[in-house]
Amino acid sequence: MSHRVLGTERISPREEHVLTPNVTAILVAAGRGTRAGGGLAKQWRPLGARRVIDWTLAAFDRATQVSELLVVLHPEDMDLAATLTAAKPLRCVSGGATRSASVACALAAVADPEAIVLIHDAARPVVSADLIARVVAGVIETGAAAPALPVVDALWTGAGDRVTGMQPRDGLYRAQTPQGFHAGAIRDAHAAATGAAADDVEIARAAGMPVAIVAGDEQNFKITYPQDFARAAALLKERDKMDIRTGNGYDVHRFGTGDAVILCGVEVPHDRALMGHSDADVGMHAVTDAIYGALGDGDIGQHFPPSDPQWKGAASEIFLRHAVALAAERGYTITHMDCTLVCERPKIGPYHAVMKAKMSELMGLQPDQVSVKATTSERLGFTGREEGIAALATVTLVRT
């Protein structure tokens, strides 16, 4: 691996909005490891309410960056393919005699050479949404990326039961998966590989590909020994606890010269326009802030500073899409949104249905999960004096 570490930083929200690569998650589940004990291969063994492979599959199924799922099975396990389920497109292929051969079988099934592939051990069921997002961002930025943790313990060499020396730990990392590449590049690297390889990073580097390190996760360990099942089950039970969050958002914009206002993504004719650094969509801003609030992650001003000229006149749906994607990356599903617009004029009623449809589309929600309504302030305050429009929003998030 190269020694550049791409910690937890993200690509910019504008880049995130524009870049929507096709991402295939390849889950390697063709092994026959015996160290974990039991009669079944470890990926098929129960882990709480699900099997190991089901937990792993669900993690990538929830990841917003992932487009499809490709599972590599042992030839004798192909009859179990029908027991695997996912919301996203799911395919299963038969693996080979070694891990590398199994990965090569999966890569042969990915048609787009520019697609990003995330190659992951099915026996790492506690992989997080944040880690998946970091690897995808690393591939977008550098072409290849993999998670790892720096070695922090002292390292010895030994013979039998005696210490024979010390090993410097500077520059040493514990490798994890998913390891991300462009499909065509890593497929060519596998085709050129000779001999055994510890993982796909070794194969990539042998082909001359630089690989960036992204920050790994201590919980993303590989089930290897019998005691690992209890540890993984405890972590997944804790993660699976019901976590419901509510966020509130409030925004206001004053009137200025113009002939229309934009509210909840819909242009409404009016004798004035709302003033703001972006398109001044007060409704969408309130909803976006409500999502950030539920995540405990600041507000629009922190993610899209008004001092940054790139957001001058920007469409507010960029901000909302960013907040929705951020919630999904952190493992949350938005289950409901309620937005109230406060103004004397323009009248919102004729545009209510199209506003609701627009917000449903942008947030990936059903119509009955979205409410957009309007009220007046009975001629009181700045909205009553028709100096501007205010909006309040409440959003509910559930960890999935």
Swiss-Prot record:
E.C. number(s) listed in UniProt: 2.7.7.60, 4.6.1.12
Residues involved in 4-CDP-2-C-methyl-D-erythritol 2-phosphate binding: D251, V252, H253, H277, S278, D299, I300, G301, T375, T376, S377, E378, F382, R385
Positions contributing to a divalent metal cation binding: D251, H253, H285
Gene Ontology terms describing biological process: isopentenyl diphosphate biosynthetic process, methylerythritol 4-phosphate pathway; terpenoid biosynthetic process
Region named 2-C-methyl-D-erythritol 2,4-cyclodiphosphate synthase: 245-400
Site location (Transition state stabilizer): R35, K42, H277, T376
Pathway of action: Isoprenoid biosynthesis; isopentenyl diphosphate biosynthesis via DXP pathway; isopentenyl diphosphate from 1-deoxy-D-xylulose 5-phosphate: step 2/6; Isoprenoid biosynthesis; isopentenyl diphosphate biosynthesis via DXP pathway; isopentenyl diphosphate from 1-deoxy-D-xylulose 5-phosphate: step 4/6
Keywords per UniProt: Isoprene biosynthesis, Lyase, Metal-binding, Multifunctional enzyme, Nucleotidyltransferase, Transferase
InterPro entries in alphabetical order: IspD, IspD/F, IspD/TarI, ISPD_synthase_CS, MECDP_synthase, MECDP_synthase_CS, MECDP_synthase_sf, Nucleotide-diphossugar_trans
Catalysed reactions, semicolon-separated: 2-C-methyl-D-erythritol 4-phosphate + CTP + H(+) = 4-CDP-2-C-methyl-D-erythritol + diphosphate; 4-CDP-2-C-methyl-D-erythritol 2-phosphate = 2-C-methyl-D-erythritol 2,4-cyclic diphosphate + CMP
Residue ranges the record marks as coiled coil: none
A molecular function GO annotation: metal ion binding
Cofactor(s) annotated in UniProt: a divalent metal cation
Spans annotated as 2-C-methyl-D-erythritol 4-phosphate cytidylyltransferase: 1-244
Cysteine disulfide partners in this protein: none
Sites annotated Positions MEP for the nucleophilic attack: R169, K222
Family affiliation: In the N-terminal section; belongs to the IspD/TarI cytidylyltransferase family. IspD subfamily. In the C-terminal section; belongs to the IspF family.
Task of the protein: Bifunctional enzyme that catalyzes the formation of 4-diphosphocytidyl-2-C-methyl-D-erythritol from CTP and 2-C-methyl-D-erythritol 4-phosphate (MEP) (IspD), and catalyzes the conversion of 4-diphosphocytidyl-2-C-methyl-D-erythritol 2-phosphate (CDP-ME2P) to 2-C-methyl-D-erythritol 2,4-cyclodiphosphate (ME-CPP) with a corresponding release of cytidine 5-monophosphate (CMP) (IspF).
Protein name (Swiss-Prot/TrEMBL): Bifunctional enzyme IspD/IspF
Gene (UniProt): ispDF
